[in-house]
Amino acid sequence: MASEKILGVDLGTTNSAFAVMEGSDPEIITNEEGDRTTPSIVAHDDGELLVGKPAKNQAVQNPDQTIASIKRHMGEEDYTVALGDDEYTPEEISARILQKIKRDAEEYLGQDVEKAVITVPAYFNDRQRQATKDAGEIAGFDVERIVNEPTAASMAYGLDEDRDQTVLVYDLGGGTFDVSILDLGGGVYEVAATNGDNDLGGDDWDHAIIDHLADNFENEHGIDLREDRQALQRLTEAAEEAKIELSSRKETTVNLPFVTATDSGPVHLEQDITRATFESITEDLIERTVGPTEQALEDAGLSKSDIDDVILVGGSTRMPQVQAQVEDLVGQEPKKNVNPDEAVALGAAVQGGVLSGEVDDIVLVDVTPLSLGIEVKGGLFERLIEKNTAIPTTASKVFTTAADNQTSVQIRVFQGEREIASENELLGDFHLTGIPPAPAGTPQIEVTFEIDADGIVNVEAEDQGSGNAESITIEGGAGLSDEQIDEMQEDAEAHAEEDEQRRRRIEARNEAETAIQRAESLLEENEELVDEDLEADVNDAIDDVQAVLDEDEPEIDALETATEELSDTLQEIGKQAYQQQQDAQAGAAGGAGGMGGMGGMADGPGGAADADGDDEEYVDADFEDVDEE
């Protein structure tokens, strides 16, 4: 194993996955629960923050304190969620998920993991990318690279392909949709074009089923289940299960007993949904994938006949409706040799291997998904970097003032494809001052855009006459200062210590309860072989362990000590029982005049039980051309 690993992380809307290079191949890491994916869910329950499967398992009973699909809000200004008495930004919620991923990876690998490559939807804008990077830093990662999800998936796919080819990656996840076209060959992964919809994903198919079920129920009973948070959570889980079942079956039944109650008593929900009905109520959603796919082909200057292979990414691509649409759009059946839930994490691990030196001869050439520029006179959007430009990249353009004696300008940075600046996404703004007074049109102000390999933008403006310059690294309204990140890291670390204490307490309790069960079982099985004194010692040791367990907040050390003493006592049962068996067999053998009694050695009870019980789930420029009015 290399001395340093760079973790590949697919931070998904619905589920997350993580992987690392093992030799020449990327390998998915199983989490603490033994699963290959981790639900992207955080909840607050009884003073604790739960992450992943434990959070998902309690969602029905605790919907108001359960947060899912936070990825859809990454980079949103002033957006927070309440858990317990605290408010959390999307970055902080995502950091909790990443913190669990980091801890589980370290446990799996047996070493610290400080560095990560984290993926984002290809159509994420700069603010969303910066927010993702902030989340990684809050979780304690040194984020080595932000990589587009379809690009990462192509890297996982391309490891087994030697030929040059053009690949279309169709990525429909839980909350976002991306389509990218890449040229693969000679170890180079070059993105030709990308497009997508950041507000379209498997969650929307779930919501369509929820509305279908709720509308039918309301028509029959006059009750809108969507107004009851607990009933809505049950509907949400049932809708997701129905969607999954309808990917392999023609019909499924949704059965929710006691979903609500009236004055007459409890009311149950039981409805059949056919695949035909499901596809009918989601037809508008599948149609929304057509435009971005066709636009990506157009931007790449390709027709569907130029595509050699189609890769499906994201669990939502398992729906037959989606696969049929892709085949119709591209004219060929998609590849099925890439696991849609794992491909992105595997590709991120490959990129991590490239950065760490574990993987040679691979070059990733990604693109910026949207055009970047500034606002100029009249509110127009002046592009400096066009969409689908390979990154990292730099572009400059010279502007001037629009008023006499103008001594400052405002640079407003936008990202998007609309011609009117205000219709695009405002990423940030700053002022350049100290421009010597001069007639309009005289000053020469050079604006330079630089996009790094993570797709994060830096903008600089310099007055060429005076040499005055100002710059900004775009973080948007949701960007975090170093001080904020440090504070959140400290907060995350504090929770990590609490989590570790809870982990130890749970493990100690599990081992104690298992030891008691084993002791009682051994006493019963060996009742005739154990003398009264030893039986009394064992019962006393059991009582000591149980006494600690019965405390409101058992001391971990005390519980571990009592359990160890009980285990030591149990060894005596094995020894005593074994010795008595040997004595009995020796006597029998002596009477028979032979060695036949030796066969009994296979049945010694001393080592039959395992003290390790199963772990329970861990709770763990207005820059005009330039014009100042």
From Swiss-Prot:
InterPro entries cross-referenced by the UniProt entry: ATPase_NBD (IPR043129), Chaperone_DnaK (IPR012725), Heat_shock_70_CS (IPR018181), HSP70_C_sf (IPR029048), HSP70_peptide-bd_sf (IPR029047), Hsp_70_fam (IPR013126)
Disulfide bridge map: none
Composition bias, Acidic residues: 611-629
Chain intervals with Low complexity compositional bias: 576-587
Keywords: ATP-binding, Chaperone, Nucleotide-binding
Bilayer-crossing regions: none
Protein's UniProt keywords contain ATP-binding: yes
Family label: Belongs to the heat shock protein 70 family.
Alphabetized NCBIfam families for the sequence: PRK00290.1, prok_dnaK
Protein's name in the database: Chaperone protein DnaK
Upper taxonomic lineage: Archaea, Methanobacteriati, Methanobacteriota, Stenosarchaea group, Halobacteria
UniProt gene name: dnaK
